């Protein structure tokens, strides 16, 4: 067994996936635990290959005009454009599959 810290793994909470800092390295999927501050608005983007699933564990956010809160899940399919606006300090668990760290295209 290993004991590790999230702060010692990948950027922005990504701790499983196909990148050197991952605590488990795999090309199959990526996992992160991430917090975003109230008022933050992501740059709109999409993925060509991956599907991304986010579970909101705390806080509230709007993605493409739809409000999400604790227990809500968002699924983004390849090619779907989206942007998150955080209404409150928000925490999410996100999974992307497959793991293709370069598959993010800003609009």
Can you describe what each PLM-predicted range is?
Residues 1-33, 43:
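A short, N-terminal "cap"/entry segment at the start of jelly-roll beta-barrel domains
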Residues 23-25, 33-34, 42-48, 64-66, ...:
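Short histidine-centered beta-strand/loop micro-motifs
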Residues 49-62:
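Glycine- and acidic-residue-biased ligand/ion/polar-headgroup-sensing regions
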Residues 49, 67, 80, 88, ...:
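A generic "binding-loop/recognition-motif" signal
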Residues 53, 88-107:
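A short hydrophobic beta-strand segment most commonly corresponding to one strand
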Residues 5-6, 64-83:
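Short acidic-glycine-tyrosine-enriched beta hairpin
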Residues 31-35, 53, 73-75, 94:
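Conserved hydrophobic/aromatic beta-strand scaffold that supports enzyme active sites
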